[in-house]
């Protein structure tokens, strides 16, 4: 199967309990017989690993992309076949160490151990180890990686953007998007189940005529616009673009698997 994320791990990322910059992230080698399961949550559920898990050294998070030095596992005893790599947060206890990413599309895998040294190179493309991609703003993704946005507990709001708004990957805080239409609404009944962010539809009430809504923006409201980080620009909303005419507007989120957005590949 393709590289993917563990839904339970992504729940923790969305809940702000993973700080990829300061937490001890490690990589473990799994045998070819390991079967990925969406229900796996902790290292203890993975079964046996090959060799000793290694920490990710010299981690960087730039534009929502996690990278680190290539892995060096040293000499590994012969007789095993490495089928995949799992990234996890090491709490010091395998029963509470959450698994985050499952990688089986890695250069050199599968690999039969023969007593020699094993090194695992990371992808040098745009994804590196893992990437939080659109519709998330890169700067917002950096804050998600750092655990500074808790989608369950923080004040997450949605604002309407005019069709003239031009997405810019450098946009970081609410003033960067310019004027919004109407009054931003708090997202109610939020969930992060399985690494998928969802909420109740947002009711903006009656909006004055004369504007055209092209997209919506999610942000964390800190109480000060200049420090309220942008999270995502969502264009795939039913009914958009929409010309306001004085009537009411309810933003309806997708009923598809990704809902508002998902950290688990489709």
Ranges and model annotations:
Residues 1-83, 90-214, 221-266:
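Small cysteine-rich, disulfide-bonded extracellular modules of the LU/uPAR three-finger superfamily
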